Amino acid sequence: SDDKCQGRPMYGCREDDDSVFGWTYDSNHGQCWKGSYCKHRRQPSNYFASQQECRNTCGA
Protein backbone atom coordinates (compact mmCIF):
# COMPACT_ATOMS: atom_id res chain seq x y z
CA SER A 1 0.00 0.00 0.00
CA ASP A 2 1.00 3.61 -0.49
CA ASP A 3 3.13 5.40 2.14
CA LYS A 4 0.57 8.22 2.16
CA CYS A 5 -1.91 5.77 3.65
CA GLN A 6 0.33 4.93 6.61
CA GLY A 7 0.69 8.50 7.82
CA ARG A 8 -1.12 9.69 10.91
CA PRO A 9 -4.69 10.59 9.90
CA MET A 10 -5.52 14.28 9.96
CA TYR A 11 -8.27 15.02 12.44
CA GLY A 12 -9.10 18.64 11.89
CA CYS A 13 -8.12 22.23 12.36
CA ARG A 14 -9.83 24.01 15.24
CA GLU A 15 -9.73 27.46 13.63
CA ASP A 16 -12.52 27.32 11.04
CA ASP A 17 -11.28 30.19 8.87
CA ASP A 18 -7.91 28.47 8.60
CA SER A 19 -9.22 25.01 7.69
CA VAL A 20 -8.46 23.17 4.48
CA PHE A 21 -10.87 20.27 4.05
CA GLY A 22 -10.11 16.99 2.37
CA TRP A 23 -9.98 13.26 2.98
CA THR A 24 -7.69 11.14 5.10
CA TYR A 25 -7.10 7.41 5.44
CA ASP A 26 -7.40 5.78 8.85
CA SER A 27 -5.39 2.56 8.74
CA ASN A 28 -6.87 1.38 12.07
CA HIS A 29 -10.34 1.31 10.55
CA GLY A 30 -9.36 0.77 6.91
CA GLN A 31 -11.54 3.67 5.81
CA CYS A 32 -11.32 7.14 4.31
CA TRP A 33 -12.73 9.90 6.50
CA LYS A 34 -13.42 13.56 5.85
CA GLY A 35 -10.99 15.79 7.71
CA SER A 36 -9.15 19.08 7.63
CA TYR A 37 -5.82 20.64 8.45
CA CYS A 38 -4.71 24.16 9.33
CA LYS A 39 -3.49 26.26 6.40
CA HIS A 40 -0.61 27.73 8.39
CA ARG A 41 0.76 24.22 8.99
CA ARG A 42 2.29 21.96 6.39
CA GLN A 43 -0.14 19.80 4.44
CA PRO A 44 -0.12 16.34 6.07
CA SER A 45 1.11 13.47 3.92
CA ASN A 46 -2.13 11.63 4.65
CA TYR A 47 -4.25 14.16 2.73
CA PHE A 48 -6.38 13.49 -0.32
CA ALA A 49 -8.40 16.01 -2.33
CA SER A 50 -11.31 13.60 -2.81
CA GLN A 51 -12.78 10.47 -1.30
CA GLN A 52 -12.24 8.69 -4.63
CA GLU A 53 -8.52 9.55 -4.65
CA CYS A 54 -8.21 8.31 -1.06
CA ARG A 55 -10.00 5.05 -1.85
CA ASN A 56 -8.06 4.46 -5.05
CA THR A 57 -4.70 5.13 -3.40
CA CYS A 58 -5.33 3.22 -0.19
CA GLY A 59 -7.68 0.53 -1.42
CA ALA A 60 -10.38 1.48 1.10
Swiss-Prot record:
Show the InterPro entries listed in the entry.
Kunitz_BPTI_sf
Answer whether the UniProt record assigns the keyword Protease to this protein. no
Give the record's GO CC terms.
extracellular region
Q: Which UniProt keywords apply?
A: Cell adhesion impairing toxin, Hemostasis impairing toxin, Platelet aggregation inhibiting toxin, Secreted, Toxin
Q: Which domain of life is it from?
A: Eukaryota
- Where does the record say this protein resides? Secreted
Q: Which SUPFAM superfamilies match?
A: BPTI-like
Motif Cell attachment site — list its residue ranges.
14-16
User: Where expressed (tissues)?
Assistant: Expressed in salivary glands.
Q: Does the keyword Secreted apply?
A: yes
- Chief location of this protein within or outside the cell: secreted
Instruction: Name a GO molecular-function annotation.
Output: serine-type endopeptidase inhibitor activity
Q: What does this protein do?
A: Tick salivary platelet aggregation inhibitor that plays an important part in the anti-hemostatic strategy of ticks. Inhibits fibrinogen interaction with platelets. Acts by binding (in a divalent metal ion dependent manner) to the glycoprotein IIb-IIIa receptor (ITGA2B/ITGB3) on the platelet surface and inhibits aggregation induced by ADP (IC(50)=99-104 nM), thrombin, collagen (IC(50)=64 nM) platelet-activating factor and collagen. Interacts to unstimulated platelets (Kd=42.5 nM) and to ADP-stimulated platelets (Kd=39.4 nM).
Name of the protein in its database record: Disagregin
